[in-house]
């Protein structure tokens, strides 16, 4: 795309995305405010608006007469900004402002204290100095490595921060890491980068303090709240490595995880694999000892995974959520338009759990006051795939709706969209389980 700038003074360039005009009206000249811009070249705005063509042009209340496009702080079509760590302007694949809000509007479950948002009134790190340009991926990566409480000051409008490297949690920087986006911040992997990584057994991230097996050490509690994750990718990350596969937005092995008032759009991981999963989130955990009770639960509260066509997450298994050995409490949330894209089931190619893939032994899945709809699994459990291998685990669906989750190659009779192996049949309480 070329832009020729004339008839302007000053600075503060801004790039706006606008709908393409008709061919007959494309004169190449735009009179905008005090400036006259000449522009040419088309771009295709990616997945957020399927098939729509857009033009980018530069505007300003004051601008240089022979300026160049800024590398960060790029407004999107509705005033949101894109912040990068340099390079040419590039709209991230997903425009989060086109996505649905966080949470299920009809969800009214009371949230226990353990599942509520954390206090961030005394942050350890504030990313940004009041402008989108000051909120960079590098600043975020460095803040996560430091630990503590992270907030953002990126200006009054929504901002998307595009990462060029994964933010990794260090296990020796305190027992809790809180990331609060203030309902304005989107973290984007740009379609190539996993966004967040935590692993208690990765030596490179320092083993957590204390004695005992790193797998069972409580480690760090990672809390993400009031924030959006888009276009994270864990494709090409092999299973069985320290940077274990799955979890396009968040990969958490060990430790604890809480997600409150968050959105996850178009996050992905590998298309094939027997256990690899979690387009949005993958959680790996282990029991302290056999019979000791379920593993530390993941809290997912008032959050949205997908939520409308074109925004769903995908992976071989667990299009949105995937876990081995972990339990979940999911409240007032929406999981829709997610896909388990693998195929072959037990042959090792996946395809299980369109929305949720939950595997382990003494595990518990509680879904309360939530909506799970329009998810797809090529094999089993288009809504939920729940397998307690020793049949000690349990699943409960309360005050919720599951619908339009089509049958793959197998499912549990009488439970459309489910495949369940547990100590007892799924506990369905005041819920609608619909085809």
What spans do the regions from the language model cover?
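Short glycine/acidic-rich loop motifs that flank beta-strands on beta-rich extracellular proteins
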Residues: 189-193, 233-240, 268-276, 309-318, ...
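Extracellular beta-strand-rich solenoid/capping regions of secreted or surface-exposed proteins
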Residues: 141, 145-146, 162-178, 186-225, ...
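The right-handed parallel beta-helix/beta-solenoid scaffold, focusing on the short coil/turn
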Residues: 148, 159, 167, 175-177, ...
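Acidic Gly/Asp/Thr-rich repetitive segments characteristic of extracellular carbohydrate-active
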Residues: 127-151
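Bacterial N-terminal signal peptides
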Residues: 50-61
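Ser/Thr-rich, Pro/Gly/Ala-heavy low-complexity intrinsically disordered linkers and tails
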Residues: 31, 35-40, 60-91
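Bacterial N-terminal signal peptides that target proteins for export
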Residues: 39-52
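Right-handed parallel beta-helix
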Residues: 181-184, 219-233, 256-270, 287-311, ...
């Amino acid at each position: 795309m070329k832009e020729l700038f004339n008839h302007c003074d000053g600075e503060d360039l801004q790039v706006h995305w606008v709908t393409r005009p008709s061919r007959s009206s494309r004169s190449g000249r735009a009179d905008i405010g005090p400036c006259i811009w000449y522009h040419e070249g088309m771009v295709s705005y990616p997945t957020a608006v399927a098939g729509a063509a857009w033009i980018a042009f530069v505007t300003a209340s004051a601008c240089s007469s022979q300026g160049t496009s800024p590398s960060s702080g790029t407004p999107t079509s509705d005033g949101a900004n894109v912040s990068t760590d340099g390079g040419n302007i590039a709209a991230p694949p997903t425009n989060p402002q086109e996505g649905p809000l966080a949470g299920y509007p009809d969800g009214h479950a009371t949230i226990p204290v353990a599942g509520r948002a954390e206090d961030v009134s005394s942050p350890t790190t504030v990313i940004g100095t009041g402008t989108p340009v000051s909120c960079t991926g590098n600043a975020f990566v460095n803040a996560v490595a430091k630990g503590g409480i992270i907030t953002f000051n990126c200006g009054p409008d929504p901002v998307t921060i595009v990462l060029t490297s994964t933010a990794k949690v260090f296990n020796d920087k305190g027992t809790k890491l809180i990331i609060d986006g203030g309902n304005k911040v989107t973290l984007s992997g740009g379609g190539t980068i996993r966004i967040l990584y935590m692993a208690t057994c990765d030596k490179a991230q320092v083993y957590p303090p204390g004695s005992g097996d790193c797998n069972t050490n409580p480690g760090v509690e990672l809390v993400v709240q009031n924030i959006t994750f888009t276009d994270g990718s864990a494709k090409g990350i092999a299973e069985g490595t320290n940077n274990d596969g799955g979890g396009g937005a968040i990969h958490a092995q060990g430790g604890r995880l809480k997600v409150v008032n968050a959105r996850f759009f178009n996050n992905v991981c590998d298309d094939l694999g027997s256990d690899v999963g979690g387009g949005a989130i993958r959680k790996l955990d282990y029991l302290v000892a056999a019979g000791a009770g379920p593993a530390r639960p993941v809290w997912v509260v008032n959050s949205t995974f997908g939520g409308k066509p074109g925004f769903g997450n995908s992976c071989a298994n667990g299009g949105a959520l995937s876990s081995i050995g972990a339990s979940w409490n999911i409240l007032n949330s929406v999981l829709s338009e997610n896909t388990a894209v693998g195929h072959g089931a037990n042959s090792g190619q996946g395809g299980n759990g369109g929305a949720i893939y939950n595997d382990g032994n003494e595990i518990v899945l509680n879904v309360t006051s939530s909506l799970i709809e329009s998810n797809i699994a090529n094999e089993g459990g288009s809504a939920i795939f729940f397998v307690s291998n020793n049949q000690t685990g349990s699943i409960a669906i309360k005050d919720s709706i599951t619908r339009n989750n089509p049958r793959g190659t197998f499912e549990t009779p009488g439970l459309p969209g489910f495949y369940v192996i547990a100590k007892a049949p799924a506990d369905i309480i005041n819920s609608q389980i619909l085809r």
